[in-house]
C-alpha cells in the first residue's frame, strides 16, 4: 500500500498552530520547547490531494536533463488555496517559490518550488487548485553568469566554482559533486545561465547532472561507481533471490533513433580543437548519420578523441533497447514498493521480458535516465525511462557488468 504525502512550506507567523505567540498564557511561555518561533514550516496538505504527477530526468540517453516538474491537484471547495480569500489560513502565503516536497511511504519523491497556483471552478460549487512545481534547475536556468574567468581545472571543480558564484550561491549542504576526470578550458564565460553552462560541463565530462528526488544537486563523473542491479523488472513471477517487480507495461524500440556513424566534436577554445571520426562499415550499411557538438569545454585534444570514440562505439549500430517500463505501485508488496521508490536516476536495473510469451526471453541491464509518477486515487503508476547498458563501467566479477569481450571498458 502506497501513502503519498504532500507538504508545502509557509510562514504563518502567529497563526502557526505550534508557533510562539506573545502574551499568550500557553503559547507565550518563555523557554518552552513546544511553541517555538515560527519561520517557514512544512504543512501536510495530503488530505486534499486529488492527483500527483512528477517528471524528472530525460527520455533519451543523449538528451540533457532539464528542470524536473510536478503538478499537484488539490480540493479547494473552501477556498483555502485561493490567493484572494482573506479569511483563509494561508492568505498572503500563496506565492511562487514556496517549497514543496512530495513523499511516498516517507520516501522522498520530489522536492521543488511553486511556479503557479491555477484555480478551477466546476459545476456544483466544486473547486480545485493545481499547483505547478519545478525543481531547483528552474532557479539555475534563471541565474545568468555575470562573468566567470576560471583556471584550467577538472569538471567537478568547475561545477563547484559555478555553484559558489554570488549570483548562484548554491548551499554546500545541497550538493553532491564528484571530482570529475576531464580537464576543462580556462576560457572566460558570461551571459549564459548557470544551468546551461553546468550542462556543458556535464556533457564534456560524459557525466550526469541532475537534481535528486530530495532536492540536492548531483554531479556524477563518467565511470562513476556503478550500482550492480539488485532489482529486476519482469513479466515472470517465478521466485528469485533478487527483488523482482512485475511491470504493467514495457516499451521497446529497435531502429535509428540513436544511430550515428560519424561523430564530430569541437571545443570552444580561441582556436577550436576538432575531432571527426567515422565507422565506414556502418556508414556503408546505414548511410552517413552525424552526431555533432561544437560547444564542448574539453581542453585536451586526446580527451576529445576519447569522447568521440566512446560515442561512436555506443551508437554506431541500431540497438534493440527497452525505452521505458511502467509499474502499478498498488499491486506491489511492501518490499517491492520500497525497492521501486528507492530507485534514482543513474541506478542500474535489469529488465526481463518474453514478448507475447514466446521464448526465449529478452534480458538486458539498463540505466535509469528518467522517472515519472502519475498517481490518482484509483491507480498509482510509476514509469522509468531507460538507457540500454551497452556502454558503462566494467565491474570485475559482476555477472552483468563484468563480461569480457564487450564494449563496456569506457575511458
Name each model-derived stretch.
Residues 1-153, 185-206, 241-246, 329-332:
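Assembly/oligomerization scaffold segments
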Residues 68, 110, 127-129, 215, ...:
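Envelope-exposed proteins and targeting segments
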Residues 73, 103, 132-134, 350-352, ...:
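Residue-level recognition of well-ordered beta-strand positions that form the cores
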Amino acid at each position: 500500500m502506497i501513502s503519498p504525502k504532500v507538504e508545502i512550506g509557509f510562514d504563518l507567523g502567529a497563526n502557526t498552530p505550534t508557533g510562539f505567540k506573545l502574551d499568550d498564557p500557553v503559547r507565550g511561555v518563555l523557554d518552552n520547547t513546544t511553541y517555538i518561533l515560527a519561520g517557514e514550516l512544512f504543512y501536510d496538505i495530503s488530505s486534499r490531494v486529488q492527483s500527483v504527477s512528477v517528471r524528472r530526468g530525460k527520455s533519451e540517453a543523449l538528451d540533457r536533463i532539464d528542470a524536473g516538474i510536478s503538478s499537484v491537484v488539490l480540493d479547494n471547495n473552501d477556498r483555502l488555496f485561493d490567493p484572494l480569500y482573506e479569511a483563509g489560513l494561508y492568505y498572503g502565503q500563496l506565492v511562487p517559490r514556496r517549497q514543496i516536497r512530495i513523499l511516498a511511504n516517507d520516501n522522498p519523491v520530489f522536492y521543488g518550488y511553486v511556479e503557479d497556483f491555477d484555480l478551477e471552478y466546476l459545476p456544483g460549487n466544486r473547486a480545485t487548485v493545481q499547483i505547478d512545481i519545478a525543481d531547483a534547475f528552474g532557479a539555475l536556468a534563471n541565474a545568468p553568469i555575470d562573468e566567470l574567468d576560471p583556471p584550467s581545472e577538472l569538471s567537478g571543480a568547475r561545477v563547484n566554482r559555478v555553484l559558489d558564484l554570488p549570483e548562484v550561491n548554491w548551499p554546500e549542504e545541497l550538493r553532491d559533486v564528484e571530482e570529475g576526470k576531464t580537464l576543462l578550458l580556462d576560457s572566460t564565460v558570461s551571459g549564459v545561465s548557470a544551468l546551461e553552462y553546468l550542462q556543458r560541463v556535464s556533457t564534456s565530462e560524459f557525466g550526469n547532472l541532475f537534481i535528486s528526488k530530495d532536492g540536492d544537486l548531483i554531479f556524477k563523473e563518467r565511470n562513476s561507481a556503478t550500482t550492480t542491479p539488485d532489482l529486476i523488472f519482469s513479466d515472470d513471477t517465478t521466485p528469485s533471490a533478487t527483488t523482482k517487480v512485475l511491470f504493467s507495461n514495457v516499451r521497446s524500440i529497435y531502429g535509428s533513433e540513436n544511430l550515428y556513424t560519424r561523430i564530430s566534436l569541437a571545443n570552444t577554445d580561441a582556436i577550436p580543437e576538432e575531432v571527426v571520426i567515422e565507422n565506414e562499415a556502418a556508414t556503408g550499411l546505414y548511410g552517413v548519420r552525424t552526431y555533432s557538438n561544437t560547444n564542448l569545454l574539453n581542453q585536451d585534444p586526446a580527451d576529445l578523441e576519447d569522447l568521440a570514440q566512446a560515442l561512436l562505439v555506443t551508437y554506431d549500430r541500431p540497438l534493440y533497447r527497452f525505452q521505458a517500463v511502467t509499474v502499478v505501485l498498488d499491486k506491489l508488496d511492501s518490499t517491492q514498493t520500497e525497492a521501486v521508490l528507492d530507485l534514482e536516476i543513474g541506478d542500474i536495473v535489469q529488465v526481463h521480458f518474453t514478448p507475447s510469451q514466446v521464448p526465449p526471453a529478452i534480458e538486458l541491464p539498463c540505466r535509469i535516465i528518467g522517472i515519472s509518477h502519475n498517481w490518482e486515487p484509483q491507480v498509482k503508476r510509476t514509469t522509468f525511462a531507460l538507457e540500454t547498458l551497452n556502454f558503462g563501467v566494467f565491474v570485475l566479477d559482476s555477472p552483468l557488468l563484468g563480461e569480457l569481450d564487450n564494449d563496456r571498458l569506457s575511458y
